[in-house]
Amino acid sequence: MPKIILNEKQVDSPEDDNLMSFLQARNIAVDNLILEFNGQILTGKDPLGTILLKDGDTLNLFSMVGGG
């Protein structure tokens, strides 16, 4: 079972899991998030369902905040 680093915490991921299903299983909506996956910036517009997770992958989530 791959171990993923999610916001600096180690979590398990099912074998052959993709990034979108990983997030959905944790009830994480990507609409207003910026994702840093292995040092690369992604958004909900990227094809997250095609990114397969591997042991040691790193994912950091940042929420968009607006204001004035």
Question: What is the predicted function of each stretch?
Answer:
Residues M1-G67:
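Ubiquitin-like/PB1-type beta-grasp interaction modules and other compact soluble beta-rich domains
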